[in-house]
Amino acid sequence: MAIQTSNLGYPRIGLQREWKKTLEAFWSNKINEEQFLTTMKEIRLQHVKVQQEKGIELIPIGDFTYYDHVLDTAYMLGFIPSRFSEFTSYLDVYFAMARGSKDHVASEMTKWFNTNYHYIVPEYEEGLQISLKDNRPLRLYEEAKQELGVDGKPVILGPYTFLKLAKGYTQEQFATILKQLVAPYVQLLSELHAAGAQIIQVDEPIFASLTKEEVQQAKEIYEAIRKEVPNATLLLQTYFDSVEENYEEIITFPVSSIGLDFVHGKEGNLNAISKYGFPADKTLAVGCIDGRNIWRADLDEVLTLFTTLQKQVQTKDLIVQPSCSLLHTPIDKTEETHLSTELFDALAFANQKLEELVLIHSALTQGTESISNELETYRNVHHTIRSSAARNREDVKAARTALKEEDFSRPLPFEKRYELQQVALKLPLLPTTTIGSFPQTTEVRQTRKEWRNGIISNEQYEQFIEKETEKWIRYQEEIGLDVLVHGEFERTDMVEYFGERLAGFSFTKNGWVQSYGSRCVKPPVIYGDVAFINGMTIKETVYAQSLTEKVVKGMLTGPVTILNWSFVRNDIPRKEVSYQIALALRHEIELLESSGIRVIQVDEPALREGMPLKEKDWDAYITWAVQSFLLATSSVANETQIHTHMCYSNFEDIVDAIRALDADVISIETSRSHGEFIDTLKHTTYEKGIGLGVYDIHSPRVPSKDEMYKIVEQSLQVCDPKYFWINPDCGLKTRRTEEVIPALEHMVQAAKDARSLLKTNA
């Protein structure tokens, strides 16, 4: 039996975020197109070289992108919205789709399955001519071959997942459009095969959650493709969960290899193999290293997995690979020497995961004695971190044990609370607010850097933060907003900020991962029991409130978002970690309330993304996610108004969960998704406070008052004006001041116009 090492995808951003810096330099006209393309090529080839040097045999080609791999596929197949027809060059069209332009909104952006990566949603329009507009995978395959002598493994997004992720068609049209994808995929695969590609990875993560009818539909497409390209070696790759429910059918697909996730879908995939076996004429690609977390693998557990598989699988070959693309992990841990030895030793970033694949390959091909020293090291590392004091706090265990049913609910129902809050807050009809953050200018970032490097004192830094806060309180007053925010100038990241102030967290220096486009985040590491230490937001919020007679919101990140946007310890259930975070935030919320803050926002933008892919698993997740939010927020007085915020998700799946959060007001992204949530509310009622975002903050364009008014008008057709709020889609941290102020002025004017109309019609 031949055994090969493979990788599904490599982080794009570069060890020092060179990719991000190159993108942003190009967007700001600091480099020209030729310089941009040259630098991107250097980064792309460097990533291939690293994987080659680590000993990976099947190196992914085509996983590299200038923004997003789904957008790459949309452009390649001609899914280009007509509103961008004025643009002629590839990069102009491509980035207009991703970021919008002065006159046109960007394509929608949403979460990639249940990860914190965002993809650009492909748009189908009537009359669209689907064809292979650009065989980018072929160009990159030939580039790696010519420049480095690497016969790589082209990676493409499969036709079924691609179309399922797209929008703009009716369900009745789906089958017809799917058939139209056959010809361009045939051409794509034919050209790759003709160029010498030995194996082509076709990603179909959607296969983890399809109905039996959908799987049959997908199979027919693969049969049509195989008929035209009989000799191409295709690896059908699934990930993020098992394909247990449809495994029996999937293993009959006309492909040469099938990739399964034995980390996040281990139990289901093993059950399926035990029941149905695996085709002897296909290669099994075993996703055995976690591509979504940062912990060293349990090599003993992985080798036991292969022992089990080799007893049950009579395949000719095996491939050893990560569970999914390493896009979701930082690149290399070698710079993290500031961490404690027990934590550093327990980590494995992308490059270390590649090394683990090679270790496993050695054990499988040469026997476990060939890696006996490494096995002993791994066992010691796991024992040390498991038995550490940080993971065994008695106070945290006692607080969890003491929880009672009443800790998870507010004293009064929403309607009665809201009446009391209206009396206390004295807000107008259709109150206006923002989501929390204001522009993190070059000056803000530079001053923070100087403070962290010891160039300026704590006192100087605090004075600067107070100056920025006061400036933006005055801006908000002048604009005419009703509920103000302090601006979050002291925060680099909405999760990192809280993690730095809670026990149980640690932070990397260079643990960056891509969130969307050039936006990179550095997730905290939850390695121990989480506990409250001191007040985290009191000083800045109370200072902001002292500057104005208007209401200032306290701003916190919710427990489920902190959990989902962190790298989380894997020795206890995620539910338990979430409850620990919730208890710490509960303490902070009580401190804010006792300090006179009457509106407190607890953001949960990541609640939806944490949902399992399979609908049968949703209820269990939603139950503890909602309970975590309630645990954090339920100890305040009825007069204290709890807000929450969510963005970029398929909300129709979780309307009931949103309702169960029992937040007094929820703000939700609406404009970038082109009003889809408004459509959802046409079919259900939401009887609590709600603000549907009236403009997309991820685009530099300043929307007109009329655009925003139109969204307000549409929203009021499905929302009770008594409970309706007006706000942007999301925080304004990434925007420039000269974009923010006119946009908010337009928003306030739209609110005034809507109030006038409501009074006229009353």
Curated annotation (Swiss-Prot):
Function, as annotated: Catalyzes the transfer of a methyl group from 5-methyltetrahydrofolate to homocysteine resulting in methionine formation.
UniProt pathway annotation: Amino-acid biosynthesis; L-methionine biosynthesis via de novo pathway; L-methionine from L-homocysteine (MetE route): step 1/1
UniProt-listed CDD domains: CIMS_C_terminal_like, CIMS_N_terminal_like
Residues binding Zn(2+): 645, 647, 669, 730
Identification of the protein by name: 5-methyltetrahydropteroyltriglutamate--homocysteine methyltransferase
Keyword Methyltransferase appears in the UniProt entry: yes
Listed EC numbers: 2.1.1.14
Active-site positions on this chain: 698
Keyword tRNA-binding: no
Gene Ontology biological process terms in this record: methionine biosynthetic process; methylation
InterPro entries: Cbl-indep_Met_Synth_N (IPR013215), Cobalamin-indep_Met_synthase (IPR006276), Met_Synth_C/arc (IPR002629), UROD/MetE-like_sf (IPR038071)
UniProt record similarity statement: Belongs to the vitamin-B12 independent methionine synthase family.
Residues involved in L-methionine binding: 435-437, 488, 603
Note on cofactor: Binds 1 zinc ion per subunit.
Keywords, comma-separated and alphabetical: Amino-acid biosynthesis, Metal-binding, Methionine biosynthesis, Methyltransferase, Repeat, Transferase, Zinc
Binding positions (L-homocysteine): 435-437, 488, 603
NCBIfam families: met_syn_B12ind (TIGR01371), PRK05222.1 (NF003556)
GO MF term list: 5-methyltetrahydropteroyltriglutamate-homocysteine S-methyltransferase activity; zinc ion binding
Cofactor: Zn(2+)
